[in-house]
Amino acid sequence: MDPTRGDSRYNLNYSMSSIGLSLADPADMYGNPALGAGRPPSGGLLQNMGGVPPMQRPNPAAGAPPAPQCQTLHSPQHASQQQQQQQQQQQQHQQQQQQQQQHPQQQRGLKRSGSDCYEDHHRSSGGLTLQGLDNVASGAVDDSVDNYNPLPNKKSPPANGKKTKGRVKIKMEYIDNKLRRYTTFSKRKTGIMKKAYELSTLTGTQVMLLVASETGHVYTFATRKLQPMITSEAGKQLIQTCLNSPDPPSVGGGDQRMSATGFEETELSYNIADEDSKDDRSPTSSGNESDDSSDVEMPAEAAEVATKLPASKTEVSAPPAASCSAATASSGHKTMPALNYQTDTNSGPSTSTAAGGGGSADSKYVYSAASIANIPQKMLRQLIQSGHLQVHAEEDGNQYVTIPLSSTAANLIKSNKLTASGSGASGSGTPVKNDASADKPLTIKQEFD
């Protein structure tokens, strides 16, 4: 490339031919190892040329102008300029070394040696003039500043040290923000429904869950045995009655939190056998099929639920009692003792037919001892101590447990007994009290208001 052309990068104060090299002769530049070995770096190039006479070669492309340029190299004024350039170059070199020590990962903008400059024709004269040195120095500072500033932003972590907040413990109090409250309700309602399904599926237990939103919607989940509590008309009325009732006053204080071990277990209980547990997990079993558990448990559960919710005693007690009679009548493979209808008179309790005592106000249903054989005596005593059952002592010394039922439940039991049992129940005229054991076991008796 001819340095005398119009490119400003090659408008130099001297010619490359003054140091014995010509850009038009690449053989001397690359083919002579002696020149390559003895070539000084660009930093000390001008200093070594101070007392050396110039070696000129014929350069037809350069023409005549190199002669006056070579004369200016040996003038005293030019020598002082060379010293100033050398001092400035040394200072800039020291600054670059300091920057390299502080930021070793940044290698851009550093001054290259003379051998590197000769390998690149376009940058061969960049470090030989004051203008070129200024450009290199400014480029080094600019590059270092431009490359240094974005790095802390890319590698620095967030202010909190984490990308997300993670698990945050919230206060167990009412959420005032409506949007947050609705979002929390939706998420936690879905979660608790899923947990109820998992509990019933994994353990085979009966689960019933009811969630009422503040917008008036009711969401429920129930397994097979507990579905009548939600789907039956009595269950729906009970739910609506409870939800429409005013908020009860807090017993333990308004700020009392629900503990992990309290307010969960109730006094309700039921018996379950091996076949009954298999029946629970069978999806094809119907509600009217009888199992090994005693049919007495249904009225007992009805009475206990009625005791828990006295305001809606009629609705809760009626369907279990009706299903109990239906299950007793439809059981074909298992014969349960028939209910003995008993009327209390002035002369003492006497056994009569079901039809004859239908209109008596103080009539009672008494289960025989065989029908309650599956109920543990300990459980009965616990129910008596809790107040769910009532114990009455008769004249003969036997103790009877009575379960008060409403008039609606009594009429249902009487009508079902008349249609299902017929004359079979009237044929059994044996008093139930005579079946009591020697240690006077507890006997369940149903008493109507």
From Swiss-Prot:
Any one annotated GO CC term: nucleus
- UniProt-recorded name of the protein: Serum response factor homolog
A single GO BP term for this record reads: imaginal disc-derived wing vein morphogenesis
- Coiled-coil-forming residues are none
Ranges of Polar residues composition bias in the record? 69-80
Q: What does this protein do?
A: Required for the formation of intervein tissue of the wing. Acts in a dosage-dependent manner to suppress wing vein formation and promote development of intervein cells. Might play a role in the proper formation and maintenance of the trachea.
Keywords assigned by UniProt, alphabetized: Activator, Developmental protein, DNA-binding, Nucleus, Phosphoprotein, Transcription, Transcription regulation
Extent of Low complexity compositional bias: 81-107, 317-331, 345-354
Q: Sorted alphabetically, which Gene3D superfamilies does this protein's record hold?
A: Transcription factor, MADS-box
* Modification Phosphoserine, positions: 156
Q: A single Gene Ontology molecular function, please?
A: protein dimerization activity
Among the Pfam families in the record, one is SRF-TF
Q: Where is the MADS-box domain?
A: 167-225
Localization of this protein: Nucleus
Question: What PANTHER family does this protein's entry cite?
Answer: SERUM RESPONSE FACTOR HOMOLOG
Looking at the record, which segments are called Disordered? 23-166, 270-360, 418-449
Domain of life assignment? Eukaryota
Q: What is its main location?
A: nucleus
> What tissues is it present in?
After germ band retraction, high levels of zygotic expression are observed in a distinct subset of peripheral tracheal cells distributed throughout the embryo and low levels in somatic muscle. Expressed in the future intervein tissue of the wing imaginal disk from the third instar larvae until eclosion of the adult fly (at protein level).
